[in-house]
């Protein structure tokens, strides 16, 4: 590493007839230089088989390169569909090749809990497995009718329990440590997400005292959330994150905070008492109270919090980072950066990889303007 101008990840690469020299302003910069060197070779270098008859020459170059954005990430949702450790590592390899340095690991959601929490074993014993839902059945249908093996659900992710066919899986804490070590070598930080207070059906269905009422399920739009009025629920959430934080040696944790069904909060005596005791006027403010309480817990353990852009509603703390995903909420980035909060652009209209080309064109992605309606000072927070 050496004195290379530019944001973290900048590097120089010089290739001459007898040597190659790579200098980065950080470990990530050196990795980026190595990946550029890798791309200079003939494409056969990516073959997993032995290749013969290829001239392994590279052009003589002098490259000075630096990223426009220090945060270049991708999110993998392992709840809706579970991915094995080997599959996660394969994604990390691709990320490194394309100089992406932040792996956002969406570890939990309504459809499955994917990380071992030793204090709460039912989260993975029961919460990691589900009966086939409509999306699963559609994947199976397409795998057969379209003869598309990529859509098939692998047999090693299926088990039979009391006559029921269940789909899922989870990572042990040793698995997590293995992935962390693998990512570190490739210059990739991991941002773990345990989504709350919504998207917690896999948790609230298996432990009492976490939701507002014993009956859990789906409201008018989203699933039953955590009850922010119960101290037992707050303790549950903090105990989970305490184990998570002990595993991941990074600056950030992601709390989620999106798509919260607040119907139960309006009729829950514990929630209404919490609102009264803290002079909260709306359920949106109650959600912010919960988010801020969790953020103070994170800060006390040396971590900073990221949340989906819903955390702006009801009041945003000065220290949180906002991940803007709702492309229809066009002023989210403007509001957050106006008060000095960093914003990570993840607009679904451009960046959701499960959208078909007719809905999310390459031109739309390429032409996204991350500086629109922002002052230079605000632009520096993107």
Predicted regions span which residues?
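Contiguous, structured surface segment used for ligand recognition
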Residues: 1-69
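Short, solvent-exposed amphipathic alpha-helical segments in soluble enzyme
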Residues: 37-39, 91, 360
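Pocket-edge structural micro-motifs
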Residues: 1, 15, 24, 78, ...
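Substrate-binding groove of N-acetylhexosamine-processing glycoside hydrolases
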Residues: 187, 234-252, 259, 273-382
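Short glycine-enriched loop/turn motifs at secondary-structure junctions
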Residues: 15-17, 220, 316
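Solvent-exposed loop/turn segments at secondary-structure junctions
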Residues: 27-29, 39, 81, 110-112, ...
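Substrate-binding cleft of carbohydrate-active enzyme catalytic domains
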Residues: 69-303
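Short helix/loop capping segments that flank catalytic or ligand/cofactor-binding pockets
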Residues: 30-33, 84-86, 191, 332-333, ...
């Amino acid at each position: 590493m050496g004195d290379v101008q530019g944001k973290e990840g900048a590097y120089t690469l010089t290739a001459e007839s007898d040597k190659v020299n790579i200098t980065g302003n950080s470990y990530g910069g050196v990795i980026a230089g190595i990946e550029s060197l890798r791309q200079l070779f003939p494409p056969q270098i990516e073959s997993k088989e032995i290749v013969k008859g290829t001239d392994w020459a590279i052009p003589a170059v002098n490259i000075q390169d630096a990223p426009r954005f220090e945060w270049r990430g991708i999110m993998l949702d392992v709840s809706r569909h579970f991915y094995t450790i080997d599959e996660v590592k394969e994604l990390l390899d691709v990320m490194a090749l394309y100089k992406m340095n932040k792996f956002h690991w969406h570890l939990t959601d309504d459809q499955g809990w994917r990380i071992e929490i030793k204090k709460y074993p039912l989260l993975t014993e029961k919460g990691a497995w589900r009966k086939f839902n409509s999306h699963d059945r559609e994947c199976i249908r397409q795998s057969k009718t379209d003869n598309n093996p990529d859509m098939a659900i692998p047999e090693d992710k299926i088990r039979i329990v009391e006559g029921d066919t269940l789909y899922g899986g989870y990572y042990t804490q040793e698995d997590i440590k293995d992935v962390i070590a693998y990512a570190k070598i490739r210059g990739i930080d991991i941002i773990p997400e345990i989504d709350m207070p919504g998207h917690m059906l896999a948790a609230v269905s298996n432990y009492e005292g976490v939701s507002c009422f014993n009956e859990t399920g789906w409201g008018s739009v989203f699933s039953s959330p955590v009850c922010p009025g119960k101290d037992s629920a707050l303790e549950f959430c903090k105990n989970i994150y305490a184990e998570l934080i002990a595993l991941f040696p990074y600056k950030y944790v992601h709390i989620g905070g999106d798509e919260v069904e607040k119907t139960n909060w309006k009729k829950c005596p514990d929630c209404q008492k919490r609102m009264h005791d803290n002079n909260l006027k709306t359920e949106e403010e109650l959600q912010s109270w919960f988010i801020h309480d969790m953020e103070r817990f994170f800060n006390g353990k040396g971590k900073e919090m990221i949340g989906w852009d819903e955390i702006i509603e009801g009041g945003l703390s000065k220290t949180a980072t906002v991940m803007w995903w709702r492309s229809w909420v066009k002023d989210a980035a403007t509001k957050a950066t106006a008060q000095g909060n960093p914003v990570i652009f993840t607009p679904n209209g451009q960046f959701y990889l499960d959208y078909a080309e007719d809905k999310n064109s390459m031109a739309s992605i390429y032409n996204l303007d991350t500086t629109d309606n922002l002052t230079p000072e605000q632009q520096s927070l993107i």
